[in-house]
Amino acid sequence: DGTWTYFAGDIAYHSNKISRKFDMLINILGADHAGYTKRIVSATKAISENRVNLICKVSQLVKLFKNGEPFKMSKRKGDYITVEDLIKEVGKDSTRFMMLNRSNDVELDFDFKKVTEKSKDNPVFYVQYAYARINSIFRLLKLNLNAKIKFDNKKFTLNQYEIEILKKISEWPRCVEISSNKLEPHRIPFYLYDLATLFHSYWNLGKDNISYRFISDNKPTSTTKLIILKC
């Protein structure tokens, strides 16, 4: 009947990208558009003569919960929450972290209460709290977190928990590389949560055993721990 379709407009949109010399295109689609991917990928190959690679990432739905109950949205009734509303409620950092904290092919339950509570169950708080604890040590010692720390290699010793933390830290470059190559950003918050868990566990050991505390009268040991914290 002459009515424009989404497909026609999208072909023109992708053609414009190709004309701007992009050789890889990425589309992020909702789960309800999963069946659309083959058509647009085929169209992109045709108009680019197979020169351009179009990757379609299908994201599952985000379910919102308030006070433990599902928040049912309806455009017709005017009951809905925008991204702007979400950011105002919990903050942009929490919103970004939680949205990335699941693979795109897995549904996400976004609980307002959980995202704002101060507990291990809130990954945003748990990771930020690790950073806050590290900074508190440097403030207490009146040291600049970015300053170089002098140490004696011969006196540089590590216990099993410190070795475990350093092993995890050494995985960071590889984690970033895989996340980029596979287009899987959820690997980043997963990694940060695991690293924060190791740090908090080690911190808690110091409550009962002074040899595990980050600040002590043993200067070589304290220096070793400060270097780990800088990492």
Language model feature labels by segment:
Residues 1-231:
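Non-catalytic interaction-recognition regions
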